[in-house]
């Protein structure tokens, strides 16, 4: 076992006995940019990544509009400066206010049952709609939809995690 992996493993073992479980996703992705709430890595979700910046200088990176919406709801005491979102195709961060959004369609969303994707150009948004369905939307529309979808999305996430846990237990016993 190499030194880096060994020290990371030791850190996780020691930390699990001291730090609350809510920090586990963050600790397991140490050294990588990962979503504060679910631990999903930017390297795997660069097409849906979001960054929120507040007036107090704080900011956060999130795997999806779902997790970014949670952050917005929890930080109503801060003034929002801007929201950046990844262009679906290019994965570069763009202003969420000026992005061309698509809501719905056949392409599965990240952490949600109703997908919400951002595009830098109107042409790319149209191409996506032609290929996968969905409707054009604004930032206001997708944020409202994210909050409307929250309860159902949380139930879906819990169900998926339970299924993954049961599958892991099953394979560990075989």
Task: Give the predicted meaning of each segment.
Residues 2-12:
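N-terminal Sec-pathway targeting helices
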Residues 20-61, 65-174:
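Intrinsically disordered, low-complexity linkers and terminal regions
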């Amino acid at each position: 076992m190499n030194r880096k992996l060994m020290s990371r493993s030791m850190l996780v073992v020691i930390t699990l006995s001291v730090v609350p479980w809510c920090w586990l996703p963050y600790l397991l992705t140490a050294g990588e940019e990962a979503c504060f709430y679910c631990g999903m890595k930017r390297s795997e979700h660069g097409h849906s990544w979001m960054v929120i910046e507040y007036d107090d200088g704080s900011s956060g990176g999130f795997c999806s509009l779902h997790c970014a919406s949670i952050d917005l709801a929890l930080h109503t005491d801060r003034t929002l400066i801007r929201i950046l979102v990844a262009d679906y195709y290019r994965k570069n961060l763009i202003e969420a206010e000026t992005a061309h959004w698509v809501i719905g369609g056949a392409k599965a969303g990240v952490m949600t049952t109703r997908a919400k994707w951002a595009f830098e150009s109107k042409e790319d948004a149209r191409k996506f709609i032609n290929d996968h369905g969905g409707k054009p939307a604004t930032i206001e529309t997708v944020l409202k939809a994210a909050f409307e979808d929250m309860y159902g999305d949380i139930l879906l996430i819990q169900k998926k995690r339970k299924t993954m846990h049961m599958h892991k237990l099953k394979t560990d016993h075989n």
